[in-house]
C-alpha cells in the first residue's frame, strides 16, 4: 500500500469546570474546539513482525515508547482488528503537555485513517469502547464541530459554524495533566445550559488555571 497521510488537529478547552469525580475520572463541563494547529501522521504497511513508530519534529524528544500511538496499535491488535503491521510516522507540531490533546488527537486520527481506508471495520459501540480504553479525550478527535462536555463524560455537538481568532502562547514551563488533576480539591457548581454560553466565553473560567500558576510560581 502507498503511504497515507492525514492532519491531526489540536483541541483547546475554551473553558473548563471540574464539577465532580467518579471512581476513575473527573467530571468536566467544557466547550471544546479543534484548532488549526496540527501534527502530521503518515501510515504505510510494512513486512515486519512488529509495528514501528517514528516521531520527529520540535516536540518529539520527550515522547516515551508507551505513547498513545503504541497504545492504539496494541489495543487494535488485541481486538484482532489489524491483519498487517504498519509504520506510523508522526511529525509533532503540537507541544507536549500543553493541554491541547496532541496524544489523544493522534490516536483518534490513526483510527480514522484505518477506518477511512477500510483497514478496520468497527461499529459505533466498539469504537467508543476502544476510544475510552486509550484515553478520555480521544473521542473529541472524531468531530470537526465545536463540542461541549456535559459533565457526564458525554460529548454534545454545538450547531454553530463560528470563526474566531485564537492567540496561543507557548510558555517555557510544562505541567502534566495527571499532576494538575491530582491537585483538584474543590469542585465547581455545574453550569446550566453550558452550550448557550459560547457567545459569552468571557464569563467562563478554567478551574485548572490557578493550579498551574501555583505550580509554576513554586
Predicted segment positions?
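A short, flexible low-complexity segment enriched in Lys/Arg and Gly/Pro that occurs
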Residues: 70-85, 112, 202-218
Amino acid at each position: 500500500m502507498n503511504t497515507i497521510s492525514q492532519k491531526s488537529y489540536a483541541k483547546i478547552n475554551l473553558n473548563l469546570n471540574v464539577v465532580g469525580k467518579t471512581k476513575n475520572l473527573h467530571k468536566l463541563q467544557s466547550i471544546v474546539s479543534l484548532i488549526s494547529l496540527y501534527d502530521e501522521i503518515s501510515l504505510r504497511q510494512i513486512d515486519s513482525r512488529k509495528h514501528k513508530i517514528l516521531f520527529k519534529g520540535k516536540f518529539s524528544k520527550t515522547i516515551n515508547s508507551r505513547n498513545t500511538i503504541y497504545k492504539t496499535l496494541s489495543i487494535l491488535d488485541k481486538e484482532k482488528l489489524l491483519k498487517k503491521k504498519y509504520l506510523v510516522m508522526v511529525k509533532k507540531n503540537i507541544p507536549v503537555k500543553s493541554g491541547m490533546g496532541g496524544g489523544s488527537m493522534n490516536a483518534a486520527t490513526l483510527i480514522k485513517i484505518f477506518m477511512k481506508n477500510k483497514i478496520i471495520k468497527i461499529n459505533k459501540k466498539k469504537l467508543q469502547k476502544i476510544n475510552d480504553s486509550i484515553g478520555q479525550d480521544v473521542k473529541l478527535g472524531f468531530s470537526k464541530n465545536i463540542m461541549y462536555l456535559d459533565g457526564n463524560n458525554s460529548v454534545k455537538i454545538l450547531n454553530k459554524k463560528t470563526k474566531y481568532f485564537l492567540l496561543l502562547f507557548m510558555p517555557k514551563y510544562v505541567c502534566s495533566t495527571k499532576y494538575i488533576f491530582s491537585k483538584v480539591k474543590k469542585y465547581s457548581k455545574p453550569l446550566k445550559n453550558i452550550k448557550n454560553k459560547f457567545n459569552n466565553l468571557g464569563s467562563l473560567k478554567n478551574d485548572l488555571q490557578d493550579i498551574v500558576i501555583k505550580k509554576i510560581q513554586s
